[in-house]
């Protein structure tokens, strides 16, 4: 673990060399979190809100929020039979039968449709029995001879041994079994919800991006840098999807709220430009603003460097490469080790006592889940996805049974850092307060064992591949 004296000494050198603030704060500025510039005698950060910041959730103890987003897994698929969590042994079918959930590899070559239409088929008016009707297909990355289609396929779960780092994190800290994907569709709109609490196409519009963006002959797109002719299907309040727009939007974002508060953000992604998972590229004022070229960072492994060198921003999103994504049909099984690498980097750094880490999955990926999601409108809420909460103040060995959604992560960030509300789904969401005990002393970090070291991910070639066979 790097010592504070190391950070301070480096900061002195940097302060001497630099006459003005760069796009990334100095090490001392960043280690002493940016809503504070000093620590009180108690060790709690003092902020512009006053000593110990009593108005903030956590009293100012949390000054960094990291949102790690993986891909396409339902709760029942990834945490089957997790102790004290609500999981199922059997799944219902549209034929009135039951299917015993069965183990399937994380690297299973078949992908399951997870469009909004597929949600409606599987949800089946609240019966939760249409999963056997979901379409599956073999990924183009796979040997077609390894694919065996079946209406049982969506009822699979990933064995614990394949995702052991996730189970270790969930066991040591908090696992939420009532975390619902806010939207009822695939990755592109889901990532918009994770930064804006909505996928509306403009501030005053009720139309929401509902599907992945595509262009004929160009595969998966998404964002203001999308190829000419790219469109995304939108959904109206009545549930109609009969209108397409270019996927470049004008609306609020958490990045904007962070900047307004004088704090910092970084969005780490595999590649720059358009992409299904590259959420900032689809928000016009971010894409064409001054911070895009400094705060949207590629490749995603730079987060490890920034943590190690004291350049962690106040709010951080971390998205994966295709191989490390957990996305069915295209991943290579390295996702759990990738997430653990980021968590371990924070845990071994001076940031640990001031950071909250949220690990979630952007959508359910078509996989079975037995819990009926609440329905607020024509596009919210979607099926359950896992949420792991990791922090020195996270409750130990705790399963949260309270209802959460993507807006809950946004609301937690607003309330811990003193940000203005987005006025979207964060308003109705809870703040994840049940997952923390801020009156307790910060826990020491315990390394998460992994099969792959961080150097494995840092040595991978930069790739601009999204799962453009998403369907």
Question: What annotation goes with each model-predicted range?
Answer:
Residues 14-17:
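C-terminal motif of bacterial Sec signal peptides marking the signal peptidase cleavage site
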Residues 19-471:
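N-terminal pro-sequences and low-complexity stem/linker regions of secreted or lumenal proteins
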Residues 1-4:
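Positively charged n-region of N-terminal signal peptides that target proteins for export
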